[in-house]
């Protein structure tokens, strides 16, 4: 996915160029802990500082009780719709960030029942 016009999320290529691993990876589908694949080329990444500053972590935690910012958390389509609706209510940069991620999430849900957030 091309991320050149993205304000909040980075492609894996952009994340790698930053020389940082302090990112939350949004991984398409169900993550396979046995394969231990991190920083997938189809993933989008958001820096931990930005995730916190936007309140995206709190938004997700409010909808997905098992959300773990340091581990793996699966998000299904119903949860994603609730995240989008709540972000729209809250507005501002949080809504912008969720809106930026939406095309990627919608593409994911055409082929997968979940996407996985891999925490820092």
Language model features with spans:
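Acidic (Asp/Glu-rich) sequence patches and key acidic residues
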Residues: 1-114, 120
